[in-house]
Curated annotation (Swiss-Prot):
Keywords of the record: Electron transport, Membrane, Mitochondrion, Mitochondrion inner membrane, Respiratory chain, Transport
Lineage of the organism: Eukaryota, Amoebozoa, Evosea, Eumycetozoa, Dictyostelia
Protein name: NADH dehydrogenase [ubiquinone] 1 beta subcomplex subunit 9
Membrane topology classification: Peripheral membrane protein
Disulphide connectivity of cysteines: none
Subunit and partners: Complex I is composed of about 45 different subunits.
One GO CC term on file: respiratory chain complex I
Species whose genome carries this gene: Dictyostelium discoideum
InterPro entries according to UniProt: NDUFB9
Chief location bin: mitochondrion
Compartments (UniProt record): Mitochondrion inner membrane
Gene name of the record: ndufb9
Function, in words: Accessory subunit of the mitochondrial membrane respiratory chain NADH dehydrogenase (Complex I), that is believed to be not involved in catalysis. Complex I functions in the transfer of electrons from NADH to the respiratory chain. The immediate electron acceptor for the enzyme is believed to be ubiquinone.
Amino acid sequence: MLSHSQKVVRLYRKAIKSIRDYSEDYDMFLLNAGDLRASLKAGKNETNPFAIQQMVKQLEDFNSYWEHPDPYIPCDGINGTKWQRNTAPAKYAVDPTNHLLENGRE
């Protein structure tokens, strides 16, 4: 079971990724991410558990509404455009004990 702070951090990271997916340029991303961070900082010192639960629910609703249908995947990341394009050979595809060339030179 996740603690409250872990849940909020995961929701925040997911929201930031959704904002990144919809942002046309980096300046727009920074502006929207700053607004999100300011809204989270505004509720940071809240002590009423019902208000906290409502804020978390609003963040969950934000994430479900703004989830991008085609999210950005880094090219070197899993399922990116360069993922496993030039993979290394299998560990013992070449016999390590027989490393001499055909004509006898190393």
